[in-house]
Amino acid sequence: MLCVACCTVFLAVTTWAQKHGSKGDDWPLQNASIGEIEIPAGTSRQVQVTYPTPDGPSFPLKASVTWSIEPAVKGISIDKTGKLTVDADVPHGTTATIHADVEKGRRKLSGKVYVFHPDENPLIGTWHVDTRVACGELQEIKAAATSQLTLRGYDWSFHASQQFWVGREHSIAARLQLAGSYRLDLKSAKIELTPTWPKKQVSHWSYLFKDGDKTLILKPLEPQDDLEAGCGYILLR
């Protein structure tokens, strides 16, 4: 899916430039976006308007931008440089909408902000799925059995919007393996995954943190084609 998107972007860039000559420079502006923004409460980060490229991450758009948050949300602000700041007392799950007026009205963009507290959802972020697995009550680390359906060796992202995906995000090798929504039960240390691509049955998992919050062990509570019985994925960040 991501590969198809990359090829589509490349063809669109080429076609636009061929049709419009020097106006091909409008491609970045016409395809610019803000996207979704995840930010921990009590922190700041720089927000940028970006545009897609065929074989890699998005690039910052070189243009004048006027930033605003509408409607206003208490404790969330953005300055004229695009620096987004969220106060520490903003509740977990709070959302806001950022607006960007690009080049005095040539483009008007918006993006959603999701505020989270790591102690209320420690999964949020991008993890790399180790090629090994953890098995048994002692979490013995060993080589995994070969499987054509494997998710190992990819990245696994949990988002504040309660969405997840497994795959590679950038470069010509971009690939989506699994995506959908998730529900976290912090007290029981369990996760419910609802895959929407490809469509699969809901699955339930237990999780365990090791090495502080740097290693995450995900173990299925139902049989999984990709894992031996009693084994789980090792996720690293």
Predicted regions and their residues:
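Bacterial N-terminal signal peptides
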Residues: 2-12
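Boundary at the C-terminal end of the N-terminal hydrophobic targeting segment
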Residues: 15-17
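Lipid interaction determinants
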Residues: 19-36, 40, 44-46, 56, ...
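Short solvent-exposed capping/turn motifs at the termini of beta-strands
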Residues: 51-55
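Solvent-exposed loop segments of extracellular immunoglobulin-like
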Residues: 61-65
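Short beta-strand segments within Ig-like beta-sandwich modules, predominantly Fibronectin type-III
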Residues: 75-79
